UniProtKB/Swiss-Prot annotation:
Coiled coil: none annotated. One of its GO terms (molecular function) is ATP binding. Keywords: ATP-binding, DNA damage, DNA recombination, DNA-binding, Nucleotide-binding. This is DNA repair and recombination protein RadA. InterPro entries: AAA+_ATPase, DNA_recomb/repair_Rad51_C, DNA_recomb/repair_RadA, DNA_recomb/repair_RecA-like, DNA_repair_Rad51/TF_NusA_a-hlx, Hlx-hairpin-Hlx_DNA-bd_motif, P-loop_NTPase, RecA_ATP-bd. Signal peptide: none annotated.
Length: 337
């Protein structure tokens, strides 16, 4: 038994990757590659940016790390199903919204909530930051949270309010939420790298990160890249950012939640002209896309518009002082009519 434990410990050390000595391991850790999984999912060009590693050596190091971490290559469908069993779900606070999402917000997936101002995007983020800390039998994952705040919308007072409604100590809940304000798109991307270092530290302390939130995803990208001439550069940068988030989710079995802004399509004459910003890059990378709309008073309507395995559908929920809650039956019936 002890030999197996030693072997597992060896596997997670960077120095055990063929071609990686103590000095290279030190440089990798300083660059944010603190585990063999992080090395295994890196690209050769990314690793070549670490001092002293050529692109040729980077390819060899990545291949060796993939073998040790058992990442890459083909696997049978039943093995994929077995791996899918490690996926967890976080309750939103509303049974109907959870049902729409197939049981809650999934780990190892990007869930995008988009809608107009006041549609409930940030409220859902705050609620998830509380709920992820609940025990598993109550819909949580007993995990920590990282929030990348691009619009200065995080409010600790709201967290305390929602936590106390769940019977939790608000100040204790806040201790497990790590917030960083992103000042531009480069800083936003850098914070994902910093999040990996923080996640490693918290993992060792027995407080694993189970949720990373970006509220909002496109705010800085839209402000900095104006006009059609900059669109290609913006989309390339955005693509890398989303893939970095996805890697984080897979490495730490964390849910990735992003909020997104909307724009009106002038070419749509009938129906709802609203669409999320970010183009095809966001559309293809987000696993679940939920369109949020304002209803009467505290009611909000969530429409699932894209998912790999769930049908399109709608759910009605309420945003109250206590947080995200189910709508009353009479409100649901009115919507169906």
């Amino acid at each position: 038994m002890s030999e197996e434990s030693n072997e597992e410990t060896k596997i997670i050390e960077l120095e055990d990757i063929p071609g990686v000595g103590p000095e290279t391991a030190r440089k990798l850790r300083e660059a944010g590659y603190s585990t063999i999984e992080a090395v295994a999912v890196a690209s050769p060009s990314e690793l070549a940016n670490v001092g002293g590693i050529t692109e040729g050596n980077a390819v060899k190091i990545i291949q060796a790390a993939r073998k040790l971490a058992n990442i890459g290559g083909f696997e049978s469908g039943d093995k994929v199903l077995e791996r899918r069993r490690s996926v967890k779900k976080i309750t939103t606070g509303s049974k109907d919204l959870d049902e729409l999402l197939g049981g809650g917000v999934e780990t190892q997936a990007i869930t995008e909530f988009f809608g107009e101002f006041g549609s409930g995007k940030t409220q859902i983020c705050h609620q998830l930051a509380v709920n992820v800390q609940l025990p598993e039998d109550e819909g949580g994952l007993e995990g920590s949270v990282i929030i990348i705040d691009t619009e200065n919308t995080f409010r600790p007072e709201r967290i305390i309010q929602m936590a106390e409604a769940k019977g939790l100590d608000g100040n204790e809940v806040l201790k497990n939420i790590y917030v960083a304000q992103a000042y531009n798109s480069n800083h936003q991307m850098l914070l994902v790298d910093n999040a990996k270092e923080l996640a490693e530290k918290l993992k060792k302390e027995g407080r694993p990160v189970r949720l990373i939130i970006v509220d909002s995803l496109m705010s800085h990208f839209r402000a900095e890249y104006v006009g059609r001439g900059t669109l290609a550069d913006r989309q390339q940068k955005l693509n890398r950012h989303l893939h970095d988030l996805m890697k984080f989710g897979e490495l730490y079995n964390a849910a990735i939640v992003v909020t997104n802004q909307v724009m009106a399509r002038p070419d749509v004459l009938f129906g709802d002209p609203t669409k999320p910003v970010g183009g095809h890059i966001v559309a293809h990378t987000a696993t679940f896309r939920i369109y949020l709309k304002k209803g009467k008073d505290d009611l909000r309507i969530a429409r699932l518009i894209d998912s790999p395995h769930l049908p399109e559908g709608e759910a009605i929920f309420r945003v109250t002082e206590r947080g995200i809650e189910d709508a009353e039956e009479k409100d649901k019936k009115k919507r169906k009519k």
